[in-house]
Amino acid sequence: MGVKIKDLHKSRQIYSFNENYFKTIDNEHKAYWLGFIAADGCVLEPTYQVSKRTGKIIRKEQGALQIGLQENDKTHLEKFQKDIEDTHNLYHNKRMKSITIKLFSNIICRDLQQYNIVPRKSLVLKFPDSIREDLLRHFIRGYFDGDGSIAFCKNKKGVISIGSIQVSFIGATSFIIGLNEILQEKIQVNEKIIKEKNPMTSNLFFSSIDHTKKFLDFIYKDSTIYLDRKYERYLIFNKKYEEYLNKKLR
C-alpha cells in the first residue's frame, strides 16, 4: 500500500512509496535495509509550526526517514527506492557531493523504532533482539555496508597482501557488544572491542585472517543485495585468501 505526500521542498510535487515496508521484516532485502538504516539512516521527529499570534499549531510535518550517501553510491539508494517503491527524485547536493533520500512517514518511523532505530540513535543504538535467525546475517551485512570497513594497504610494489587487509566495525558500544555476541554464536569468533575516546562508541576488529574469512563469507556469500564497492573488496579478499592458502600448501 502506498502513501502520497506533498513534498514541501519541491513545489507541491506528489510522490509515493510503500510506508508499510518495515512493518514486518520477513525477507533478505528488508533485513538488509534495516541494518543499513541502523548504520547510515536517520529518523527525524515530527515538527510543528506554532502561530506567534494565537499560540496554536498551524502546520504539522510528519516524522521522516533520511539516508544520505556519497554521490558515488547513488545506485545503492536507487536499489532502496526500487524495493520501497519510491517515486521521488533523490536530492543531489553537488557542493557536498552527496545523495539523499527523505521519506516523510510517521508509520515508517514507528516501525523502525521497534528495532531500536530512533532519533539521535548514534550513541544509544542496541542490537535488536526481534530479527528472525535466518535473516540476522542480512541485517549484519546491511550494518557493515553502512558502518563497516574493509581496508587495504599496498606494499612498495603496489601489491595488496592478505595480512594487510583489515576488517572492522564502528558503532554505539551497546550495539557492538550485542553484535559480537551474535558472531560468537553464529560463526564462533570472539573479537576484541576497542572503545573510542567517547566510551559510548566502540570498534570491533577481526584479529586473524581466518576469522576475517569466516565473517565475510557469513555476510556476503550467496547474498543478493549489498553495497557494490564493499562486495568488490570481499571478492578481492577471497582472491588473496586463495593465494594465501596455496602458499601454505607449498
Regions found by a protein language model. Give the residues of each.
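Internal intein/HINT superfamily modules and their associated LAGLIDADG
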Residues: 1-250
